[in-house]
């Protein structure tokens, strides 16, 4: 199993373990391991204009989640918060403007927290 397949299995396992939170949260949510290994709830997909979490997941981010989904003016803040979560195990609350599927944008507040699962650290995002 290569690293991409391994990360894919980790995301599936993480989502299964956290499924109740993803389904019941009143907030849009997504978890991020790397650009291609991510999962979201229906609320997050809908917020960005996608019909389902699967449709959002299937977007080819071409190696850059921020370029695909985040307004250029918000990319630095999101990447820095992610790096702090991974390196210093520090959560953050930041303002992020997302790109919508339709071409528009939506302004949000994101609470980002590091969460460990099977020896890997995910960034769990609550979006409102």
What positions do the PLM features span?
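Sensory modules in modular signal-transduction proteins
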Residues: 11-34, 40-42
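Short loop/turn elements at sensory-signaling interfaces that couple input to output
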Residues: 110-126
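PAS/PAS-like sensory domain cap-loop motif
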Residues: 44-60
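PAS-associated C-terminal cap
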Residues: 1-17, 128
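PAS-family sensory/regulatory domains
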Residues: 55-73
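Short loop/turn microsegments at loop-to-beta-strand junctions
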Residues: 27-28, 35, 93-94, 111
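Terminal output helix/cap of sensory domains in signal transduction proteins
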Residues: 67-97
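PAS and PAS-like sensory/regulatory domains
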Residues: 92-94, 101, 106-110
């Amino acid at each position: 199993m290569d690293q991409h397949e391994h990360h894919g299995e980790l995301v599936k396992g993480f989502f299964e373990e956290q499924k109740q939170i993803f389904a019941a949260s009143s907030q849009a949510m997504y978890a991020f391991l790397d650009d291609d290994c991510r999962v979201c709830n229906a609320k997050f997909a809908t917020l960005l204009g996608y019909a389902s979490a699967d449709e959002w997941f299937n977007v080819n981010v071409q190696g850059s989640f921020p370029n695909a989904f985040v307004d250029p003016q918000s990319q630095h803040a999101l990447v820095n918060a992610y790096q702090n979560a991974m390196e210093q195990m520090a959560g953050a609350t930041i303002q992020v403007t997302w790109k919508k599927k339709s071409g528009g944008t939506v302004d949000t507040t994101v609470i980002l927290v590091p969460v460990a699962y099977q020896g890997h650290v995910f960034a769990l995002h609550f979006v409102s």
